[in-house]
Amino acid sequence: MEQSLMDKLTILADSAKYDVACTSSGASHPAKRGTIGSCYAPGCCHAFTADGRCVSLLKVLMSNCCAFDCSYCVNRKSNDVPRATFSPRELAELTIEFYRRNYIEGLFLSSAVLGTPDYTTERMLTVLRLLRNEYHFGGYIHAKTIPGTSPELIQQMGYLADRLSVNVELPSEQSLHLLAPDKGRHSIFRPMKQISVAGEESRQELTLYCHAPKFAPAGQSTQMIVGASPETDYHILQLSEGMYQKYGLKRVFYSAYIPVSDDTRLPALDTKPPLLREHRLYQADWLLRFYQFKADEILDQDNQSFNPYLDPKCNWAVQHYGLFPVDVNRAPFEMLLRVPGIGPKSARRIRDARRLSALGLDELKRMGVVLKRAQYFITCRGFSGAHPGRGSAGRERITRALIDPNVFSAGAEQLSMFAPPAVDRLVEQGVPPRAAQRMVREEAVQCLARAL
């Protein structure tokens, strides 16, 4: 039976929900005369639904009929799910109609491998040409590059889309070979390198010719699945740092694995997604991008998993407590960034303001410094530091100020650095949820205090 456009949209939008590499673009070019849509930053407001989908972009697959059989993917060819495929004209018209009704401000376009990577990419290119050339759509377009696509097609796509992305999916070649035998390291990193080189060449051309065509002006991103394979947090973070440095990625996205198939190579269907681990990876990724940390400083060979109770920055500060306190009126900018409670914006404010006069606690508070945490790591005018004192009482006081309160609503059973009774396990034994959270929190405080 022939599917209606709404049936296709329902199937293909649902099939795209597991791809998280979709956020605010960072692109900023205003609308041009005779076009519709704008990539101007204030107009790109991205809202997210409860399951993480971005609702201001039309986030959809062109097809979920896949020739690949990646075991972690809901759209793999061996899975019995409803299938659908848009024609290029259908998808282009749907995007324009949604835009005209103010439902969306752009398009996130991906696809399962319909036949071959090149055939799939050619169909995606047809959609982009219709939007850009026939409908004169000037809004934001993020296009997913299919591993194995020929360089010529990737080059064409880069001049039509604002951002490209090639998903790494799994953090090691061994896991790719085991869980996604149709993909390989070369088919992923070759297009990633091509996009990086073409983007740099485009930027150089623009310095010489202001009307030179732009290649993926919003850069490229990628996504890794966390928890489907045995790689450690340390391994994942090392890979992310390498991709940032080698390919100039704008963003690495991390997706906690949601079991979608009963496969002995994957976690069981009743396994909970490692959301806390995903959260810690995003926090560590932020340190790499904005706080001048190196991956080896956050995790190392001896500690390859994140602390479940402290965010990565606080954990580093606790492990290097001998470097503190620092005088905010004299400390280098790089050291200010490492103080818990001081972010890049407040660090810049401190650096600029201290040139005029010495700063005290009142000035720091107005600059956005979170003194609840920072007070144990700084000195300033009129303040010699909130020394926790010697003994267990002092260590507990600083621990309570630094500990992440959000972890206790989910439990920390996914990480084995400490071994407190997990919240969920206590609740299953009949302990009230709030009481279970308090018990786990107190145990965590004791563990961290001993570590200090």
Range-by-range predicted roles:
Residues Q204-A212, Y254, K294-D300:
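Flexible, glycine/charged-enriched surface loops at secondary-structure junctions
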Residues T222, D233-S255, V260-L266, L275-L276, ...:
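A conserved active-site cap/scaffold subdomain adjacent to cofactor or substrate pockets
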Residues A353-R354:
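Residue-level signature of tetratricopeptide-repeat
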Residues R265-L337, R373-A422, A451:
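Long, highly charged, low-complexity intrinsically disordered interaction regions
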Residues M1-F68, Y72-T222, V226-P230, M243, ...:
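Conserved Radical SAM active-site core
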Residues M1, K214-A216, Y234-Q245, L275-R277, ...:
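Long C-terminal interaction/binding lobes of large macromolecular proteins
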Residues M1-C65, V370, I378, A386-L452:
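Flexible, acidic/Gly-rich N-terminal and inter-domain linker regions that tether
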